[in-house]
Amino acid sequence: MAVRASFENNCEIGCFAKLTNTYCLVAIGGSENFYSVFEGELSDTIPVVHASIAGCRIIGRMCVGNRHGLLVPNNTTDQELQHIRNSLPDTVQIRRVEERLSALGNVTTCNDYVALVHPDLDRETEEILADVLKVEVFRQTVADQVLVGSYCVFSNQGGLVHPKTSIEDQDELSSLLQVPLVAGTVNRGSEVIAAGMVVNDWCAFCGLDTTSTELSVVESVFKLNEAQPSTIATSMRDSLIDSLT
């Protein structure tokens, strides 16, 4: 299902959390409320871990990961690395990466099989990505934006891309990723999708400003609650009526 949350009144929750099918990292600090939203939905299935990366709370923008592994920038401290290692399942490989574009979450995005990366990403980083996360890597742009990690979010079920992505680009990306894609927004019209939401194969968290229409699109394209695209129209109608009453 899709749940709304905010971090210290900030709706850009994708900056403060990293969610995969085997673990969830949540920024330290913030209200206990933010952590408990994730804990409530996920704690039965995967570990929810308080963390910071390179002294920053914007962990969602600093790292990239999937069920196989997690890559963090080179300036992550030993203490932070050790804490994350101890908290995640043993099957998850964790690696530091020396990369000029150090906000890895902005320049890369992936599910458990495929990764999209910034066209200028180091060749070595690309190899580490393929090796640690066990993914096929493609250098791509989304709606002519090089920050692929900011403007699209996808799971193994589906994906949401920048609202100005052309139909041709959507088709190309969809065939690379092998999942259905929809162009859309979160947080009442925000184009920076990855900053406003996190998702895995069964659960999504969106910023508090996300409208019920946006939420129903998210639930449908990511196949949460077994929602199918055909149900978008009916659930949208219901949610529009909800928001108008």
Swiss-Prot record:
Any GO MF annotation of the entry: ribosomal large subunit binding
Post-translational modification note: Phosphorylation at Ser-174 and Ser-175 by CSNK1D/CK1 promotes nuclear export. Ufmylated by UFL1.
Entries under CDD domains matching the protein: IF6 (cd00527)
Residues with Phosphoserine modification: 166, 174-175, 235, 239, 243
Transmembrane segments: none
One family name in Pfam for this protein: eIF-6
Subcellular locations according to the entry: Cytoplasm; Nucleus, Nucleolus
CC per GO annotation: cytoplasm; cytosol; extracellular exosome; lamin filament; nucleolus; nucleoplasm; nucleus; synapse
Tissue specificity comment: Expressed at very high levels in colon carcinoma with lower levels in normal colon and ileum and lowest levels in kidney and muscle (at protein level).
Source organism superkingdom: Eukaryota
Family according to the record: Belongs to the eIF-6 family.
Record note on quaternary structure: Monomer. Associates with the 60S ribosomal subunit. Interacts with RACK1. Interacts with DICER1, AGO2, TARBP2, MOV10 and RPL7A; they form a large RNA-induced silencing complex (RISC).
Name assigned to this protein: Eukaryotic translation initiation factor 6
Organism: Homo sapiens
Record lineage: Eukaryota, Metazoa, Chordata, Craniata, Vertebrata
